[in-house]
Amino acid sequence: MPQLDTSTWSITIMSMIMTLFIVFQLKISKYLYPSNPEPKSMTTLKQRNPWEKKWTKIYSPLSLPQQ
């Protein structure tokens, strides 16, 4: 059975890594970043719910008087 020749593997792997690095650098360099990022204003509008207008009391079964 012939022996597998691995002498060119290191060159192949290194060239593949270099190519991937260059491709990713080119892809990232085309992305436009905002020059002056500013925080978004997080203002929320308070909505009135119908149950906020009236007072309600919730009785739990354990707090009811014994009968």
UniProtKB/Swiss-Prot annotation:
Component of the ATP synthase complex composed at least of ATP5F1A/subunit alpha, ATP5F1B/subunit beta, ATP5MC1/subunit c (homooctomer), MT-ATP6/subunit a, MT-ATP8/subunit 8, ATP5ME/subunit e, ATP5MF/subunit f, ATP5MG/subunit g, ATP5MK/subunit k, ATP5MJ/subunit j, ATP5F1C/subunit gamma, ATP5F1D/subunit delta, ATP5F1E/subunit epsilon, ATP5PF/subunit F6, ATP5PB/subunit b, ATP5PD/subunit d, ATP5PO/subunit OSCP. This is ATP synthase F(0) complex subunit 8. GO terms for molecular function: proton transmembrane transporter activity. One of its GO terms (biological process) is proton motive force-driven ATP synthesis. Belongs to the ATPase protein 8 family. The gene is MT-ATP8. PANTHER family: ATP SYNTHASE PROTEIN 8 (PTHR13722:SF0). The modification N6-succinyllysine is found at residue 54. It is found in: Mitochondrion membrane. GO terms for cellular component: mitochondrial membrane; proton-transporting ATP synthase complex. InterPro entries: ATP8_mammal, ATP8_metazoa. It holds the Pfam family ATP-synt_8. Keywords: Acetylation, ATP synthesis, CF(0), Hydrogen ion transport, Ion transport, Membrane, Mitochondrion, Transmembrane, Transmembrane helix, Transport. It comes from Felis catus. The modification N6-acetyllysine is found at residues 54, 57. It is a single-pass membrane protein.
